[in-house]
Design a protein with these regions (language model features):
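Pre-Walker A (Motif I) flank of P-loop NTPase domains
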Residues: 2-6, 76-77
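The conserved Walker
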Residues: 13
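Conserved glycine(s) of the Walker
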Residues: 16
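Conserved substrate/cofactor phosphate-moiety recognition/catalytic segment
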Residues: 19-74
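Glycine-rich phosphate-binding loop used to anchor ATP phosphates in small-molecule kinases
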Residues: 57-102
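Conserved phosphate-donor/acceptor-positioning beta-strand/loop module used by diverse small-molecule
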Residues: 99-121, 163
């Protein structure tokens, strides 16, 4: 069995991670495991759930997310995994998976104004987003307690590609897929994208 690839789609709130992860998984022909969707499923089995504060579902969600990834990688499934993946919270959980898969990181970025507008839009249109406290995030941003520019990306020494999601994808989806499919030969993402 050859080694599968774990494609990590990361970025701050409203940067287009989930949309890109689903599109990339479709192009690659593999599953997309979305952290927020796992939590939304947990919320469905907890009537009266309220997000915010010391959320009792955050740790079980994290455990389920990485548990599913581990099971898939152990049997050789290439997978796209999407979550914020801020360094201090997520790196300790990703590092053990590097022994099971080639790891590639995609960092979604966009202007703070665009991210803010996306958060407002999804909070209005998607009732499932209540599981994630989007309104609390917006309130914190408005009060100056949180900045969308405060995101700290994963600091792993693995091939990494930054994708601007402001207006479509830059680089384009076929190039992102080529990055995800590239062999784990130690080449820098920039060299892989030029070939």
């Amino acid at each position: 069995m050859s080694t599968p690839t774990l494609v990590v789609v990361s970025g701050g709130p409203g940067t287009g991670k989930t949309t890109l992860a689903h599109e990339l998984a479709r192009v690659l022909g593999c599953p997309a495991i979305i952290r927020d969707e796992i939590k939304q499923g947990m919320v469905m089995s907890h009537p009266g759930y309220q997000s915010g504060g010391d959320d009792p579902l955050n740790h079980p969600t994290l455990d389920a997310f990485f548990g599913v990834l581990k099971v898939l990688l152990e049997v050789g499934v290439t997978v796209v995994a999407e979550a914020a993946f801020q360094d201090r919270l997520w790196r300790p959980n990703l590092e053990p998976l590097t022994g099971l898969a080639h790891l590639r990181v995609i960092r979604c970025t966009t202007d703070a104004d665009i991210a803010h507008d996306r958060i407002i839009q999804r909070a209005k249109e998607d009732a499932h987003r209540a599981a994630h406290g989007d309104q609390e995030l917006l309130d914190s941003i408005a009060a100056g307690g949180h900045s969308l520019d405060s995101f700290v990306p994963i600091s792993l020494d693995v091939p990494t590609l930054t994708v601007d999601t402001a207006h479509g994808y830059q680089p384009a989806l076929p190039d992102i897929a080529a990055f995800a499919r590239a062999s784990d030969d130690g080449a820098s993402p920039e060299r892989m994208m030029e070939s």
